[in-house]
Amino acid sequence: MLDFMDYIQLAFAEGTQRNCDNSYSSLTATTQNLLDFTTPERVRIHLSSLSTPNFATSYTLGTVGLIEGSISYLYSNISFDNTPSKSALIPLRKLAPGYRQVQAPIAPPSSKGQKATLLHATLHLPPPTTLNALFLRRISPTMQLSLAVSSTRGPPLSKSAPQATLLTQLTHDTGKYSNEYLFSTDNSLFGWRGLWNFGPDPRFNNNAQRLSLLSAGAEAYYSPVSSLIGMSTGLRFCTLPAATSSTPNPNTPISTFPYTLTLTLTPLTGSLSTSYSVRASPNLSFSSRFGFNVYSWESEMVAGFELWRQSRKAAIVDNDGLEWARNKARIWDIPASSQVPEPITPSEEETQESVLKVRVDQSWNVRLLWEGRVKELLVSAGVGLGPSSFSPSSYANSQATAGAQGSSGGPPTSYWRGVGVSVSYSS
């Protein structure tokens, strides 16, 4: 589940009309949401608030072996008046990302007077204290600058300066294609990411209704200090919202199953990965991924799904035993046409949503995650089961160890890998 600050940053991207799907880093976003989700560790509590339309605060307290926490502040010159900030009103599907419906490429927004800016800082406690800071600025309708700083304080007796790393990212998005240029002070790393969308250019042909989208992208990294070279390329084919039902009600059946196909290749390491994700119904999605290495002949298979559950709570009517007197009084005071109360429509009822995510790999490592709303609290609970490693050999070794311990009378191997609960409240 996204924390409150990530949710506000998502609202900032929507407010500046930035298409997050038009980026190479989002090429496999759907698969990552359905298969690479993380479960909470131990117990963690989040308290957040949107104090003003431009300023937000967040406090986190957790117990992961020891008590630790963080303090976060965020400021933006873009107002968040229309952004739900109360935990009881925030749409759960925005906080629990699942199947990601890719939107059609759009033309850059028209230039406005004020340039959107966002400042975000997080201080992690206790020592070693770590400070993370983020600066975002929309330079132009097609350009965005991002500066991320991470500084860690050394040991208490150390007199050396705190270690700090600066990551600079410049994004150029035209709708038809996007380029990202990166530089990190860690080993003087230079990077580039690019994505190209096949089809008409939305800047010149924005009225064309497209049913599918084919995108190709690549990334490359180089460090002159450590002589590090990295490279990858990928393809994505997905259906667009125009291919499905145009009804605004998300509970109605869809005419065409939205699906996403991806293919990624890392030539230097010989890794090849393919994935297929489908939204079988408005509340059910499946995903699978197969990875193969041509050098080591190792393979990986992962499958998972997410299931959304919706429940409605009807309005509670108080019965104090005097309804007969009110009905008799209405006969004399109220016309007969208004005696029958209007029925409560489904939109007036309170709707509660929750989601269950399950993933399993070829080594029978299982993760289960439940996320939902309890009263005005957002709760995320998860558990991990299976061998600690994700390689097929670890599963065989664990089976052999379990058999040896069983024959010698020792305790059986535990497949319990951890459980955690995260509770969030925002106002």
From Swiss-Prot:
Keyword Cell membrane included in the entry's annotation: no
Pfam families assigned to the protein according to its UniProt record, in alphabetical order: MDM10
GO cellular component, one term: ERMES complex
Keyword Signal tagged: no
Membrane topology per record: Multi-pass membrane protein
Compartments (UniProt record): Mitochondrion outer membrane
Coiled-coil region(s): none
Quaternary structure annotation from Swiss-Prot or TrEMBL: Component of the ER-mitochondria encounter structure (ERMES) or MDM complex, composed of mmm1, mdm10, mdm12 and mdm34. Associates with the mitochondrial outer membrane sorting assembly machinery SAM(core) complex.
HAMAP family: Mdm10 (MF_03102)
Record remark: domains: Lacks alpha-helical transmembrane segments, suggesting that it resides in the membrane via beta-sheet conformations similar to those predicted for other outer membrane proteins and porin.
Family, as annotated: Belongs to the MDM10 family.
PANTHER family reported for this sequence: MITOCHONDRIAL DISTRIBUTION AND MORPHOLOGY PROTEIN 10
UniProt-recorded name of the protein: Mitochondrial distribution and morphology protein 10
Name of the gene: mdmB
